[in-house]
Amino acid sequence: MRLWNGWGNENSNLSMELNNGLRMLLTALVGPAKPLPQATLDDVIAKVPATKLTAHSLINTDPEARVRHARGQSLPDWLDMHSGNVDTFPDGVAMPESSEEVRELLVHAKANDLVVIPYGGGTSVVGHINPEQSDKPVLTIDMGKMNSMLHIDTESQLATFGAGTPGPKVEEELKKHGYTLGHFPQSWELSTVGGWVASRSSGQQSLHYGRIENLFAGGSIETLAGTLDIPTIPASSAGPDVREMILGSEGRMGIITEVKVRITPLPEQEQFQVVFFPSWDVGITVARELIQQRVALSMVRLSNPLETTSLLYMGAGEDSSGVVALEQSLSEKGIGSGKVMMTFGVTGSVRHCETVHQLALDHCANHGGVADQSGLGDNWAHGRFRAPYLRDPLGAAGYAADTMETAVDWAKVPTAAENIEQAIRTALADEGEQVHAYTHLSHVYGQGSSIYTTYLFRLGESYQQGMDRWVKLKKAGAEQIVAHGGTISHQHGVGRDHRQYLSAEKGTLGIAAINNLCELFDPKGQMNPGKLLPYSEH
């Protein structure tokens, strides 16, 4: 069973602890912190009000089920659950096992004027699945039982999955046939294929496999207006692409029940290589040139100087002698205090990997890059899904961590990255609080790159103070993203936390078009209101 107030499963052995070295580092970076009292599951269950739903055979109104579906995985969600300050719950939870049952639930919702929230893996970090304050009954539809591969067409390289299939099961089922989807967001262990489509997600190796919009070939969506079936067509010039209406729709138009995806044969080999460069500017240049020269890598990730140093020392724990030795060795090769760390991946046949790996190394060397020989790339691959597990031990020690992400054209990358990070770093200066912020580029394109900033700060004297600090930090970062013409989200989606910034990206007419499309499928605003677009009670 999933943890009710954090990341992972209750029986997981992947929980993390803060060692003394990391505690000392955090104290030096943002100051000493103190733990806050944590609410229990029983504490929160006691706050669940009586349901407003009438009885239905497919709907569970048990208070614990309602608590477990009340929040996602954003920092505000974490603060709500750990403080016990949860003020909205779904009135009931349904777990359909078929498209027919989803259809039945939507007919019931339409007839009884229910608010409907689709729920995949519950991994949203921007408030996608949180109920808004409403007088209407709220029904959360958990797709977790529609979680298997329904069909595979190896000749066309297509597979059909129930929308509630989580990442590991997607890969497990495809592997039996010698295939992979290759979609590995950091939430991969818990997030679902339907959620990936609904939030327009991006996997860590999207440079090779493509983002979810490249992998999504078609599927079925149940709406209040009927069933929308999207056929799998390799290419078409027959008007607008209907798939685009569903990609990133965040449950506003309907519930995705089946997803048809484009699959790839399992690669013979995969390698991850770390290279150090003398400066951020050099690293950005190399990342841009590698992609624009079409070097066939599967991933390029570039950490700025602060992230490079932070990751090396955080990973070292109490014994940092290995990092000190690495820095000494790099210094002797011209890589000093401004160093940055690039991790690139190669995926494919053995011959392809050998050729591309060497080509990339040669290009890096031409810019003063020094290749790591100690296996840091393998370490990254081994721990690629571990970061979310760190939030609980950080929180238990009185610290908070969160992220902001965007994407901009290459010409804007250096300035945007610097200003977003600096705005976050200084957002709590009026309180005399330090914020440790650092940045990486994780998805690169010929036109530009994503920018992903992580920040750590002290929760303070109470969970409410921690929430107030988060609001200031979020606002500071988001305003810089808008000021630099970036997307308000490259991979997390809009949800509730980003909705106020969407109009800067889409424009007045664009927002009106999206709103009209939502109203076509959902004229009374019952489907996940308050997400993607501003909330309006119909």
Where are these regions (language model features)?
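N-terminal flexible segment immediately upstream of the FAD-binding catalytic core
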Residues: 1-107, 125-157, 309-314, 378-403, ...
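C-terminal substrate-recognition/cap domain of FAD-linked oxidoreductases
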Residues: 60-81, 284-476, 484
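Short, well-ordered beta-strand elements within core beta-sheets of diverse protein domains
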Residues: 91-97, 271-278, 344-346, 404-408
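FAD-binding subdomain of flavoenzyme oxidoreductases
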Residues: 147-303
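Activity-critical C-terminal alpha-helical subdomain
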Residues: 494-538
